Amino acid sequence: MRSPAPSLPDIIAALATAPGRGGIGVVRVSGAALAPFARALTGREPKPRHAAFTHFVDAVGKPIDEGILLYFPAPHSFTGEDVIELQGHGGPVVLQLVLARCLELGARLAEPGEFSRRAFLNGKMDLAQAEAVADLIEASTVVAARSAVRSLSGVFSDEMHRLTDALIDLRMLVEATLDFPDEDVEFLENARALERLDAIRVKLERVLERARQGALLRSGMNVVLVGQPNVGKSSLLNCLAGDERAIVTDIAGTTRDAVRETIAIEGIPIHVIDTAGLRETADPVERLGVERTWREIARADVILRIVDARVGPQPGDDAIDAALPEGVERITIFNKIDLCGLEPARLQHDDGVVIQLSAQLALGVDLLRSELLRVAGWHAHGDDVVLARERHLVALRDALTHVVAARSQCGALELFAEELRLAQIRIGEITGEFSSDDLLGVIFSRFCIGK
């Protein structure tokens, strides 16, 4: 079970807005008994949940800035502790002065994710919801952001709690019967235990598939464009991105370094990487670009092998194909079909899918977008998906393995009950009901400072 919240008497403070200049900057403070802290900082008594225009003053009462003071007494705050927010002007110098004054008054700088960690430890949110805070901040598409909001509101956690409740109910029945070994078989039949177990398995499979879709929304996939020089890799990147991000010329070898662009296809972030043309070259700069291309290929989820449709695959293309890593999805692109009379098409060949298109005229590019979604395994609707992380997928897969194992142990209730217990623990790790301090440290250390 989750450990009781430790005593956290210290006060933490941090900038809650991004570094740089802006119209407004926010300093957030959390801790115990912050009313005297607010009085020392503003010279006035803070009123709970009331926006007060005031001066923020230094140790001798000299104004540092003026702005809005918000005071949220415990437990009705984000962290469950007293929280104050100081909303002032968004200049980096003045914000640092306000933050320094907070430190003078006894606060310390918050660690990354410490506000969210305190919210979790004080029961204001579970671990999946806390992770959704970071995912919402980092969301790169509208669909991903909306899915993160659903996770933050507890939709994903509610599913985990329903699965946990079903496992607990079944465990209670099993363990209550362990004192009567002669009735094991009758119990399983009369309590419809296997029926209940099968229902849990079906629910787990559905949740796992939705989590896979959510993980795809969160992380997207890396797509690397490879091919010989001047086959239209940069033109294809620009076409997909809708912008001239890569230099396009008739001179072979123009792209010397990887050019990255993230595009959204039905809300899925697709990280497209245009690379240097793969060929033998004496140019040391171009040769360095080719070496970087191979490093990008090693990290690819999908490789788009670009070929000039006017001439088809060349001997150099065979060498490239032979050197590509095994197990990585490949799509062959016949580009420049507008120059040779071919029509846009998706063709299934023995060695994989071929897309005929013209990047220059944007003909057939929708076929490529659809193929990328198919390869990614995306078949959900954004409104049904909640964001998930790799650790969620691992926990759900493990829980499913234990549920399946329990089905095979229906003749031995002790083993049956143990598999149910292990499945419950794995699901509980998602919401933080069962979590080690090491896991919490890793998760919250990846948050930004002010959350």
Curated annotation (Swiss-Prot):
Job of this protein: Exhibits a very high intrinsic GTPase hydrolysis rate. Involved in the addition of a carboxymethylaminomethyl (cmnm) group at the wobble position (U34) of certain tRNAs, forming tRNA-cmnm(5)s(2)U34.
Major location category of this protein: cytoplasm
CDD domains: trmE, TrmE_N
Superkingdom of origin: Bacteria
Residues the entry annotates as binding K(+): 230, 249, 251, 254
Enzyme Commission number(s) from the entry: 3.6.-.-
Top-level EC class as recorded in UniProt: hydrolase
A GO cellular-component term linked to this record: cytosol
Binding site for Mg(2+): 234, 255
Subunit structure: Homodimer. Heterotetramer of two MnmE and two MnmG subunits.
Entry protein name: tRNA modification GTPase MnmE
Residues where GTP binds: 230-235, 249-255, 274-277
Cofactor(s) the record lists: K(+)
UniProt binding sites for (6S)-5-formyl-5,6,7,8-tetrahydrofolate: 28, 85, 124, 451
UniProt keyword annotations, A-Z: Cytoplasm, GTP-binding, Hydrolase, Magnesium, Metal-binding, Nucleotide-binding, Potassium, tRNA processing
All copies of domain TrmE-type G, residue ranges: 220-377
Family note: Belongs to the TRAFAC class TrmE-Era-EngA-EngB-Septin-like GTPase superfamily. TrmE GTPase family.
HAMAP family: GTPase_MnmE (MF_00379)
GO aspect biological process, one term: tRNA methylation
Compartments where located: Cytoplasm
